[in-house]
Amino acid sequence: EVIGSQDARDPKLIEGGRIKIPIATVFFGTANNDDSTFTISDKVYDRAIWLFFDDKGYPFECPQQGPMQIPWSQMQALFDECGPKYPVSQTTIDKFGELDAFVIKKFRLAFGNRIMKQLKKFVPIYVGCGGTELDGIDFIFTNKILKKFESLNIGFLKNELKELIQMLDKLFGSDQFPMAHNFINNMLRMN
């Protein structure tokens, strides 16, 4: 809802105080998390997929590509195909449950049902696009759960963070979860 009531002078695309947004519309926005912003609320992290640019980008050359139009129905069909084709394994879900219990016990942060639902939708699509199940889980864990750690007093949680790295290694292997390892190690270095 844009405005609470209708007016004859409203722009033509506003009907009854509302703008109709097509289903295939994706919102891209920015949220600065710098010295002027203390933290971004959990609600925002929970409801969005975040892309963090932690490294400097470098220009590169590539051939010009023409536009490709894909109707939303086709995109949704491709997404829907991935669920049964690449479901998150029960073993991984069980391990993620253990990780959740560990994070609750050590940091008093819970993942919540919304994040589990997103994980079960996102990871099959991630795998369908050529990624691996564990890299998809790493992305969700780092960007949905570990980002919440920024609001904690890390100086008092260094031992717990080291234990978290050990737990990740125990559950998934020391060669997995590179994003999470980098994030945790950066927190340890900076505090």
Each predicted region: which residue ranges?
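C-terminal regulatory/interaction module of P-loop NTP-utilizing enzymes
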Residues: E1-N191
